[in-house]
Design a protein with these regions (language model features):
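A short acidic, helix-capping loop that chelates divalent metal ions and anchors anionic groups
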Residues: 97-102
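Active-site beta->alpha N-cap acidic-glycine motif
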Residues: 1-85, 130
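Short, hinge-like loop/turn segments at secondary-structure boundaries
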Residues: 23, 80-83, 107-109, 145-147, ...
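A cross-domain feature marking catalytic cores of carbohydrate-active enzymes
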Residues: 7-9, 53-57, 91-93, 130-133, ...
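CE4/NodB-like, metal-dependent polysaccharide N-deacetylase domain
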Residues: 41-50, 105-137, 142-145, 149, ...
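Short low-complexity, flexible loop/linker segments enriched in glycine and/or proline
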Residues: 67-70, 78, 104-107, 166-171, ...
Length: 236
């Protein structure tokens, strides 16, 4: 059986946002790419596993002036080294807006295209995209197709995860800490769990799109998600 391993390189600020914690301390701005990435990369390399790293463009954009520029340049260099090793760098949008799928087509295209330009300084071709929050829209597919992407990996057909996420978000809201996360389009919960060509106007259905949808992995029948969160809470 062939297995694809991918990691979303969301900054700590993304996790603060989804848990309603406000903004993190400045010293944590680059902790994922400075500390976690090298450790994870070493773990995979020791097992001879090639990985797809989905990158948020602004975290490696050396053209941005101001505080953190040196760290952003260094972050890009680390990822370029991993690409040289054989890993893949994927597009995870430029700003990681959780509500990206609900924004207008111009903003969606700008987020995809700007991250693509940043990544193009590190690798020759960017083939894949994953939407923030696993929420994809027809406008996203249209942008990806126009930019020549070969696959999207955003559909998450896991009803149990959706229900748990909705419950957590409701609990945070009741506690006065509204989450910055969004719930995905519920139609995605019934999407095929295996790779398929989506319909351009309905990404959760089979169709004739020029790119392939690689859904987030779930188990057969029960559709339990095979993601890091599940592994952390699963019995040892």
């Amino acid at each position: 059986m062939r297995v694809a391993v991918s990691v979303d390189l969301d900054a700590i600020a993304c996790y603060y946002r989804i848990h309603g914690l406000g903004e993190p301390p400045d010293e944590l701005d680059h902790v994922i790419l400075e500390r976690a990435l090298p450790r994870a990369a070493a773990l995979f390399a020791a097992r001879d596993i090639a990985v797809t790293w989905f990158v948020v463009g602004k975290d490696i954009d050396g053209s941005l002036a101001g505080p953190g520029r040196d760290q952003r340049v260094a972050n890009g260099q680390r990822l370029a080294e991993l690409a040289t090793r054989g890993d893949e760098l994927g597009n995870h949008s430029y700003s990681h807006f959780y509500e990206l799928a609900r924004l207008d087509p111009v903003t969606i295209d700008r987020e995809i295209a700007t991250c693509d330009r940043v990544l193009a300084k590190l690798v020759k071709v960017v083939k894949g995209f994953r939407a923030p929050g696993y929420d994809v829209s027809p406008a996203m597919l249209d942008s990806l197709a126009r930019h020549g992407y070969r696959y999207d990996s955003s559909i998450f057909p896991a009803p149990g995860y959706y229900a748990a996420k909705a419950a957590v978000m409701a609990g945070l809201a009741a506690a006065g800490r509204p989450s910055g996360a969004v719930l995905t389009d519920p139609r995605a919960l019934a999407a095929p769990p295996e790779p398929y060509r989506p319909a351009m106007t309905s990404p959760w259905r089979r169709g004739q799109a020029p790119l392939v949808e690689l859904p987030i992995a779930v188990t057969p029948w029960t559709r339990v998600p095979a993601i890091g969160t599940t592994l952390l809470v699963a019995p040892t």
